[in-house]
């Protein structure tokens, strides 16, 4: 039986006093890809921020257990060191910090956490060359400031490059398809698929079904008003694509 990577039970959370998550239940096992869909404002991105420990979001009930450990006891950087990775919908630009230095510092922080010797610049450059092929990135991007002047597709590929370097146990991709054309979407998706293995898990958050043509999920969940109200397979995403999110109003609000 596969190990449970993430177990969320009756999770409630708020931001600025407003309750956003209203009883989320979710279990993700090793080797699985899960997708969460839902209209804007349903709580999808809030869930990703709560899992990763964003300080603006307060857990008001329930629990998040990651590999047997209560996540509420960990600071955001501790969650990252424990193997949780978040690919942002809108990656930040950091002028003056080269992409290479950022990746090397992040990678060495993980090695230090694991009790391993840090890599010097030369050894790290050897390591990163093979990772660049995963997302088809030109090595010249390593010398540029982090995400500065990058196109939307380049920023998203850079997020997957970070994922390839850090080899997280749980990857959360928050609307990784946002703003991507078909070619960029294909490259990013191929990178995600390449990095999948029996020991890790991926949570894909998306608004549109088209991403799931490239990253094939094992389970699809639909969020509505802060809860997961439906779960299923690929057919559920196709049904949403055909009927639109308005059909959820009929399904969820229909009298019992």
UniProtKB/Swiss-Prot annotation:
Name this polypeptide is given: Probable ATP-dependent transporter slr0075
CDD domains referenced in this protein's UniProt entry, alphabetically: ABC_FeS_Assembly
GO molecular function, one term: ATP hydrolysis activity
Record-linked InterPro entries: ABC_transporter-like_ATP-bd (IPR003439), ABC_transporter-like_CS (IPR017871), FeS-cluster_ATPase_SufC (IPR010230), P-loop_NTPase (IPR027417)
Keyword terms: ATP-binding, Nucleotide-binding, Transport
Record: residues binding ATP: 38-45
Keyword Nucleotide-binding: yes
Gene3D superfamilies, alphabetized: P-loop containing nucleotide triphosphate hydrolases (3.40.50.300)
Family classification: Belongs to the ABC transporter superfamily. Ycf16 family.
Domain (ABC transporter): residue spans on this chain: 6-250
The organism's place on the tree of life at top rank: Bacteria
Alphabetical list of PROSITE patterns matching this protein: ABC_TRANSPORTER_1, ABC_TRANSPORTER_2
Keyword Cell wall biogenesis/degradation: no
């Amino acid at each position: 039986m596969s190990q449970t990577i993430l177990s969320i039970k009756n999770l409630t959370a708020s931001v600025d006093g407003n309750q956003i998550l209203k009883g989320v239940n979710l279990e993700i096992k090793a080797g699985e890809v899960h997708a969460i869909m839902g209209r804007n404002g349903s709580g999808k991105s809030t869930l990703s921020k709560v899992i990763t420990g964003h300080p603006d979001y307060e857990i008001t009930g329930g629990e998040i257990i990651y590999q047997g450990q209560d996540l509420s006891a960990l600071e955001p950087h501790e969650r990252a060191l424990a193997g949780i990775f978040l690919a942002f919908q809108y990656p930040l630009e950091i002028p003056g910090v080269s992409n290479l230095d950022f990746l090397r510092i992040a990678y060495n922080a993980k090695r230090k956490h694991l009790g391993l010797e840090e890599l010097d610049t030369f050894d790290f450059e050897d390591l990163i060359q093979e990772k660049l092929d995963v997302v088809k990135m030109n090595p010249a991007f390593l010398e540029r400031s982090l995400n500065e002047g990058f196109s939307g597709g380049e920023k998203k590929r850079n997020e997957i490059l970070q994922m390839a370097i850090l080899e997280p146990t749980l990857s959360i991709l928050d609307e990784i398809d946002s703003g991507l054309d078909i070619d960029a979407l294909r490259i990013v998706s191929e990178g995600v698929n390449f990095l999948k293995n029996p020991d890790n898990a991926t949570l894909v958050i998306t608004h549109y079904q088209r991403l799931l043509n490239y990253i094939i999920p094992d389970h699809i969940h639909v969020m509505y008003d802060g809860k997961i109200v439906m779960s299923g397979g690929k057919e559920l995403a196709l049904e949403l694509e055909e009927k639109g999110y308005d059909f959820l109003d009929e399904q969820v609000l229909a009298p019992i």
